[in-house]
Each structure stands twice: as C-alpha cells, then as structure tokens.
Amino acid sequence: MEVILLERIPRLGQMGDVVRVKDGFARNFLLRQGKALRANDANRKKFESQRVELEARNLERKSEAQAVAEKLDGKSFVVIRSAAETGQLYGSVSARDIADVVASEGFKIGRNQVDINQPIKTIGLTNVAIALHPEVVATVTLNIARSADEAERQARGETLDSAEAIYGEEINESARPEAFFDPEAEIEQEEGEENA
C-alpha cells in the first residue's frame, strides 16, 4: 500500500514522502497512529493544502522535544533490582521499567520512546537512548544495582565483581571456601593420625 507520511519515520522517510509499505504496517500502525494517509488523489490534495500547517506543528513539537532533551540528556537514574553474585539480574530491565524510572523523575515519556535492542540483564552502568521526537534523541545513564549503596559505589567507578567489592571488608574469613576444602590440610591430618 502506498502512503503519504505526515511526519518523519525512521528507516522509512521524511514528511511528505510517498512510500510503499506492507498493508498490515500501514493499517495497524501508520494510519491508526495518524502518521500517514493513504496515497490517493484526494489525500494528496488535502496534504498539499495542509503542508505548511503540518510543518509548523512538527517544528513546534521538535523544539519542545529539544527543550526536554537538554534537561534529560546525560542524567543518571538508579534502578534497584535483585541479582546473583555474578551480577546477573533475576529478571531484566525492560523499556517499560526504564520509562517508569524516567517518568518518576518528572519527565513524560512512553515505553515506545525507549530505544533498547534487548532487555538489560546485568548490573552496572548502561547508556540508553530515548527518542523524544523522530529527530531528537537524548541519552541517559542507568545505574543498575542491588542496593542504593552499591549504586553509589558504581557511580564513583568502583568495580563490583568480587565478594569483597560487593560486601566490603567485613566478610567472615572462616566462610571462605579454601578453608573448607584445603586438600593439603586433610592429607597432613591423615598422616598425623597414621603416625600416632
């Protein structure tokens, strides 16, 4: 189906372009969301008569998005999740979770504006792109951690890949696996028992 784009669509075209797309994509997304019109003579005339108004509205939305992007770009958000000792999350951080965290700070974004290829499944610092407008993208940093203290330490640049780094110096020395499974100590004990 041929459609006339009413706004810039990534990987498809600019406003006013006549493009051929699959029927389902046109009916279920472009036409339903008001992002395109069917490309027939009546709609082409209608688009040309409203082109100046559409371009002005698009420019206004773009300037609003740029104002929000200036406030949002480079901000850091903390996401607290439970995770294994290896840093793998029990679950994941999805686009919806990211949108909720950013919205809790007072920014209005939807989950469809968060651009991640796949859910985030490990703790650490992650950069995420947020498309506020087809031509305006802001980048935020997610600090994914097990606790607020751990998030603070990650933000300072500490690596949290060992038990000492995660739990600090207060680790019980007798709880170390080497103390339980020292094969040399077992051999010495057996030799001492045999000699007695």
Swiss-Prot record:
SUPFAM superfamilies documented for this protein: L9 N-domain-like, Ribosomal protein L9 C-domain
Compositionally biased intervals (Acidic residues): 181-196
One GO CC term, this protein: ribonucleoprotein complex
UniProt region (Disordered), positions on chain: 172-196
GO biological process, one term: translation
Keyword Magnesium: no
GO molecular function: rRNA binding; structural constituent of ribosome
Keyword NADP: no
A Pfam family of this chain: Ribosomal_L9_C
Keywords assigned by UniProt, alphabetized: Ribonucleoprotein, Ribosomal protein, RNA-binding, rRNA-binding
Function, as annotated: Binds to the 23S rRNA.
Family the entry assigns: Belongs to the bacterial ribosomal protein bL9 family.
PANTHER family listed in its UniProt record: 50S RIBOSOMAL PROTEIN L9
Descriptive protein name: Large ribosomal subunit protein bL9
Biological source species: Chelativorans sp. (strain BNC1)
